[in-house]
Amino acid sequence: WAHIERIPKTSVLGHMLIVAMLSYFLSLFLEPDPCAKRIYNNWYGALFHDLPEVLTRDIISPVKRALGELDTIIKEEESDQISKKLKPLLKEDWYNEILYFTMNEFETKILDEKKNIRHLENDIIPNQYNFDQYSPIDGKLIKTCDKIAAFLETYFSIINGVASPQLIEAKGKLFNELKNKKLDGIDIFLIIDLFR
């Protein structure tokens, strides 16, 4: 993905910002209304979701999946790089928050009463955890925003004249993955249909 020619050219950092903006705006429309910490977490979780890839020189997700067992080794390397490069620069609570955002970045999770990470079933944050004290984060929403951002990157590249077969195929696949997606009251089709 990172090596497919696109106009405008997007970097990993630019992509992360687009995902964060989408995540923030979509968080505002979640039902029931999300607590303030959930909106905060969705913004920063999306903003930092590819941070490990920045540190490991952008080994993109499809490549990781294709590597099978090596995916675990790459995840360990990403974790190691975050520890080596970020831990010395950040206060401990900030570092722990970055880990919360970047480890299993597409998992919907909370911090329980003992501040242990708890992954939630069905990627849904029940009402009883929609409070700041549980630090909820919508991993499914971030993953969806990641795909919307990729879809938009293909769309804008194609309308700007770079319409390689890979981009056209990627746009079609992403559209098909997103067209029936609904997130806590948000119909994703209404967004992507604007860019068909």
Label the predicted regions.
Residues 1-196:
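Alpha-helical, largely C-terminal catalytic domains
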